[in-house]
Amino acid sequence: MSMEEISSCESFLTSSKPYFAMISLQFGYAGMNIITKISLNTGMSHYVLVVYRHAIATAVIAPFAFFFERKAQPKITFSIFMQLFILGLLGPVIDQNFYYMGLKYTSPTFSCAMSNMLPAMTFILAVLFRMEMLDLKKLWCQAKIAGTVVTVAGAMLMTIYKGPIVELFWTKYMHIQDSSHANTTSSKNSSSDKEFLKGSILLIFATLAWASLFVLQAKILKTYAKHQLSLTTLICFIGTLQAVAVTFVMEHNPSAWRIGWDMNLLAAAYSGIVASSISYYVQGIVMKKRGPVFATAFSPLMMVIVAVMGSFVLAEKIFLGGVIGAVLIVIGLYAVLWGKQKENQVTICELAKIDSNSKVTEDVEANGSKMKISEGDNSMLSTIVISVPLSETHLKKTIQEP
């Protein structure tokens, strides 16, 4: 191989790393959903699972936070502690417990599809808390609004409409066998539908809590901008303590805490190490190199992987309403992501213009240049460039005098 071929091959491998990392991460998330579903079906308490998951995550992340971020740690004031307390409550406690309950009552594929509502819900909360401003004249703003509406419509469709079973060629025989027992299980249909509706509502609340965590985390990240591992460790640790308190109140059976070398231990360890530790590190690297939009764009892949794995491992049935709703959610997701990407591009261009104008103004002032106002006919306009502090307006205004 020539040097050019070796160089192009190395360049291809380097550019492919973010794609490989995000695809691998989606397989990891898919495995977590399948393993957790099996564990919950065998009787594992979701309250206990949340405790073990975040205790393991804390134990895994804490050493890295200590060795890499122990210098110049931010001081934990009462205000910061309350923010950490709320983040621990929103993430490990509310989000995870509601998600696991919803997963127990529905299916892994359905749960993954509903989790794709996250960007739309985050956008709604950001608008309500005035973290994002709406400009209906801009195409990117229209895309985010339309994507949010389509995403919510898809979620509602998945919740209220099942429809016929969608046959996959490798599950057709299993579904025929299941239909032979339809008469003996018809009495369970009404209760099953109620559980499905309950699970759908729980998943919506879980996604809402997750989106709320992102909105609040954006504020505290200003303090922990250089200590993100420490922030994650604190959230997991505080969330673990809160989850223990909630479990003592909600779970009165002491044997629920017992765990052996079984699927329950695998679910707790896998979730804590892969979903709450490795995923954070991988996503952080990818987001720094390619941005958050790139990282989020791979989330629908997890739904496809879970659908295939679930049909094999759990003999999961896929309904037409779920397929149509999932397609709508994915369309809405990419519309929101496209709008967000365009908004970021516009913001970067504006900041670049401001920065270049600022440098020009500084050079002029440094050289002691004086601005000259040309006087001429009434039709001619004189222009004065006024430099305004960036922190006040973020713009340079051009004033025209008659």
From Swiss-Prot:
MF terms (GO), sorted A to Z: transmembrane transporter activity
Keyword set, alphabetical order: Membrane, Repeat, Transmembrane, Transmembrane helix
Bilayer topology term: Multi-pass membrane protein
Subcellular location: Membrane
Superkingdom assignment: Eukaryota
Cellular component terms (Gene Ontology): membrane
Residue ranges of the TM segments: 20-40, 48-68, 74-94, 109-129, 149-169, 196-216, 229-249, 266-286, 293-313, 318-338
Ranges of residues in domain EamA: 29-159, 208-337
Family indicated by similarity: Belongs to the drug/metabolite transporter (DMT) superfamily. Plant drug/metabolite exporter (P-DME) (TC 2.A.7.4) family.
Name assigned to this protein: WAT1-related protein At5g07050
Species, as recorded: Arabidopsis thaliana (Mouse-ear cress)
